[in-house]
């Protein structure tokens, strides 16, 4: 019988953390965070990181493991999560993976393709060629070597277009060919849950309410301190997190406070929409309604 692992996924502001803490207090499980914002130290308010009181109730693994100046890939997450899962199981407990970064969940379940590392010289050659010939011409090149990727990647998406060409020039194989290679299935009985409100308006209201609370908790001061470090900028993955980018731009004088709030809430709602799009096509998923009384009982039944 394979060891059991629980996934609790859902859009932002759907109540994942509260339900996970309830389960941690009522069952012999440990929480692993699956969130690309919670990994960063010093980004507490805007990422809705669990409070000290909540962490005392249910410690979370894989939070505060990177400085905001550092990158962290899906491959990094997969390696770290597999190590944490194995350790929790050795302790005789059930791993509970909680979060909304769907790419991390997907990487953990399916593995990652063995793509070559970036090559700065080849990338520079591609950029120089694009400067002379234009990205449309390079897109035609991609269509010749990898029509599937060319259909998926728009000519106006130079980052992904460049990467697809770079992979081919390094390996001699197309991105499509390489991404068909998957890892072996996880050696666990993975039970997957998603939680979300039944009505979209409820989620939208929760998102707006939570951002207002973040502002009351000192979110602008948090971003001000990050900005004052001098080594962070908006091109870093950490500063692309929703809320942080909009607040940074407000502090730069790009728009006023009310516009910042409007843009941050809109960006968060767009994130939630993308998360729900992922989840609607997710196989073998058990749905829970945010705030429903029977959620804890349902989760505990699957823990046995």
Curated annotation (Swiss-Prot):
Marked site positions, Interaction with substrate tRNA: 101, 123
Cofactor(s) demanded: Mg(2+)
Protein name, per record: tRNA dimethylallyltransferase
Classification via Pfam families: IPPT
Species of the source: Shewanella putrefaciens (strain CN-32 / ATCC BAA-453)
Taxonomy, superkingdom: Bacteria
Region described as Interaction with substrate tRNA: spans on this chain: 35-38, 159-163, 240-245
Self-association state and partner proteins as the record states: Monomer.
Enzyme Commission (EC) number: 2.5.1.75
